[in-house]
Amino acid sequence: MSKDKLWGGRFTQPTDKFVEEFTASINFDKRLYHQDIRGSIAHATMLGKQGIIPIADVENIVSGLKAILEQIEAGKFDFSVSLEDIHMNIEARLSEKIGDAGKRLHTGRSRNDQVALDIRLYLRDELVEVSAYIDLLIDSIIHQAEENLGVIMPGFTHLQTAQPILFSHHMMAYHEMLKRDKARMEDCLKRTNVLPLGAGALAGTTFPIDREYVAELLDFAEVTRNSLDSVSDRDFAMEFCAASSILMVHLSRFSEELILWSTSEFKFVELSDSFCTGSSIMPQKKNPDVPELVRGKTGRVNGNLVALLTLMKSLPLAYNKDMQEDKEPLFDTIDTVKGCLKVFADMVREMKINPERMEVAAAAGFSTATDVADYLVRKGIPFRDAHEIVGKTVRYCIENEIDIPELSLAEWQLFSGRIEEDIFESITLEASVNARRATGGTALERVRAEIARAKEGR
């Protein structure tokens, strides 16, 4: 018999020392201690209510678990690799403290449904925190959009100047992305907030448990409906990691733009010194390490998603030891996403923009060429013909090393007799921006309305 194991009755030889270390998860699943104890208290309370164990035992179990919780939080609990995981560590310590009552705690329960409960409880709490961090970044974005309303910058396609837009409009694009990210987290919470406890190892339990009562004690919205699925389901973890990967892609795109915009070539923004570092050899350098790291950590979070998907892709029902590998990718994703959101929210709020530099860049690169085409359409010329006319005009400007605003009326009329004096008021940056008044456009009135709408939704 393997006497030091709670499951050792069937075994005649001790576990190999390296195998013990190789299979143990306590080094990373100990962060689930609070959820494990909370779940055990609810389970014990239900066992007592149902008359499955004596009320006196329930009282001893609850007081013992609370004492263990205090011991862990005080840093005085010695976790043992030989006890494999957080569940066995706590149960063994409980039995040591209160005797046989502690050994009755696991009645009607398996580690399979126990760990499924712990992860759901943990992720449920973390989803609320992640959503709160998303809100912090949204607040910073709205702050920048409101503070700099009216500043015009170039909008890009293919990283080439395309059309003038408001800087605030650009900021609010990230607001839209983050709104979707938050909605995905909220949707994930719905599917996470389901109680698996009571499924046993895979087939349920022979004891007259009350799962709905446990769900009520632990604030779950409902209970799972199939015991096999209950212990083998990690969809909620994969869904969170998928939502996190999309979120990190958004932060990575934002990071890329801030990195570009903060270069001496762009000079659109300046990041606070608090969020940059210097060079060990080049004294003039101010490196945007924070957005670069966020961009880099995106690959890490994406990798965690792939790890979970690959982990689960060929597992037969129900529980398999492979599933122990679900926690590290999940925990790392949670930690990484929260850290990135926190630092990004502070960095965005404190960054300074350079309106003059943005406006100069917005005026270059024939950015109002589309406005000329639209002008010609309003003069009765079909759009494809207008497009051709403006293309020839741009080529003329390139050959003569001038930009669209520098053309005289006589030069304009070389390309179309429909062009009149009013062309000049149609191709200013302000006119270009404010002409785009349809819902979702960059016109000042539209962007102001979207900022107000975003603030109302906070």
Curated annotation (Swiss-Prot):
It is found in: Cytoplasm. Pfam families: ASL_C2 (PF14698), Lyase_1 (PF00206). GO terms for biological process: arginine biosynthetic process via ornithine; L-arginine biosynthetic process. The keyword rRNA-binding does not apply. CDD domains: Argininosuccinate_lyase. Its EC number is 4.3.2.1. Signal peptide: none annotated. The keyword Cell cycle does not apply. Pathway: Amino-acid biosynthesis; L-arginine biosynthesis; L-arginine from L-ornithine and carbamoyl phosphate: step 3/3. Its main location: cytoplasm. It catalyses: 2-(N(omega)-L-arginino)succinate = fumarate + L-arginine. One of its GO terms (molecular function) is argininosuccinate lyase activity. InterPro entries: Arg_succ_lyase_C, Argininosuccinate_lyase, Fumarase/histidase_N, Fumarate_lyase_CS, Fumarate_lyase_fam, Fumarate_lyase_N, L-Aspartase-like. Keywords: Amino-acid biosynthesis, Arginine biosynthesis, Cytoplasm, Lyase. It comes from the Bacteria. GO terms for cellular component: cytosol. Belongs to the lyase 1 family. Argininosuccinate lyase subfamily. This is Argininosuccinate lyase.
